[in-house]
């Protein structure tokens, strides 16, 4: 028995090593002959950005695009379209490696959330590329990114500091899974997919922030689940940009391969660090990062009074949405408890009647 476990463990290690060798081979023989190693001398800020970017993608549920997008747009002053395509490209490698690692190591995920949110996300990415991307300006993309990050921050803050009691009743899978649950997950995935089509990230953030609240699924289970959603969404988004919607931004195509060897090292390091820290420490780090990101957006864009009112209204609407979501979750949870109590009581009554006869 012990030998069998040792063999299985060694097999997993071999598969992971082969996966990393395969990715490095693609980078070394597929991308670098076209790009050239001298690109590191002229584009060094991009791979340097992905050192913290890759770490954050492993340390939190956010993909590497959550770091690269604001840094590229606000610090390096690069085009938002380039930042979006870069995020899709680098996540297609980094998040896919993470997803394969999760599956090989049999880390617990909520399979139904992964399946239906991913299906919804792919549909949303296509829809967003057709109807939303053509009308989005770079300025609006930056504001939208801050709204997505703010949504995550609000849900994280409320879940951690305002509704502590509900954490006693979290579960590893969605209880009372019905057809309407499938519909809800498809819609959640669709919304995340639309954001991903515009920003290069978002499917994981939206799925995580809503499912943890609405269905009370354990964050430790949803974290790897959201990685799988974002991995498939990134690959789908990149392929759509390449073959359906006119190709990816030329600067992104020449830049994201430079960061591939970095993210496949930094992301696992981030995951290891996160596993050793308490949840509250990770939450505080995330909230600090989110406040800095939102503050830098308002500072860099110099919004007019009317724009500030619109953004403020959106943020207020976001708060209201999550409070409603929390209350709906409370009602949904209490109703399920009452139904379970009735079901158990009815079963006991029938058993008593049968034994009496």
Residue ranges and their predicted role:
Residues 51-61, 189-200:
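Transmembrane alpha-helix interface/packing and boundary motifs in multi-pass membrane proteins
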Residues 57, 94, 98, 121, ...:
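Residue-level signal for conserved functional micro-sites within the alpha-helical transmembrane segments
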Residues 66-110:
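Juxtamembrane transmembrane-helix termini in multi-pass membrane transport proteins
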């Amino acid at each position: 028995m012990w030998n069998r476990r040792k063999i299985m463990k060694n097999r997993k290690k071999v598969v992971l090593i082969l996966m990393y060798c395969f990715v490095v081979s693609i980078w070394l023989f597929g991308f670098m002959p076209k790009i050239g190693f001298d690109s590191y001398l002229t584009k060094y800020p991009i791979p340097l950005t992905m050192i913290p970017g890759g770490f954050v993608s492993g340390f939190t549920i956010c993909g590497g695009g959550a770091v690269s997008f604001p840094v590229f747009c606000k610090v390096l002053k690069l085009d938002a379209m380039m930042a979006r395509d870069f995020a899709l490209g680098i996540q297609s490698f980094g998040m896919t490696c993470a997803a394969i690692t999760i599956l090989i190591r049999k880390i617990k995920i909520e399979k139904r959330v992964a399946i239906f949110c991913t299906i919804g996300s792919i549909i949303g990415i296509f829809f967003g590329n057709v109807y939303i991307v053509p009308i989005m300006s770079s300025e609006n993309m930056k504001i939208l990114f801050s709204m997505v990050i703010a949504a995550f921050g609000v849900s994280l803050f409320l879940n951690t500091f305002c509704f502590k009691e509900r954490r006693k009743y979290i579960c590893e899978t969605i209880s009372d899974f019905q057809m309407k649950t499938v519909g809800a997950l498809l819609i959640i995935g669709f919304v995340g997919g639309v954001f991903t089509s515009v920003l290069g990230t978002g499917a994981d953030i939206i799925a995580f922030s809503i499912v943890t609240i609405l269905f009370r699924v354990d964050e430790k289970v949803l974290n790897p689940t959201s990685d799988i959603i974002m991995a498939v969404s990134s690959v789908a988004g990149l392929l759509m940009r390449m073959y359906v919607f006119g190709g990816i931004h030329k600067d992104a195509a020449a830049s994201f391969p430079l960061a591939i060897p970095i993210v496949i090292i930094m992301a696992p390091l981030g995951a290891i660090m996160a596993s050793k820290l308490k949840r509250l420490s990770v939450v505080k780090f995330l909230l600090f990062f989110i406040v800095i990101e939102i503050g830098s957006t308002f500072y860099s864009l110099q919004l007019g009074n009317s724009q500030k009112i619109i953004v403020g209204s959106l943020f207020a609407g976001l708060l209201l949405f999550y409070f409603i979501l929390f209350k709906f979750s409370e009602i949904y949870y209490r109703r399920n408890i009452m139904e379970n109590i009735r079901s158990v009581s009815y079963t006991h009554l029938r058993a008593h009647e049968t034994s009496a006869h």
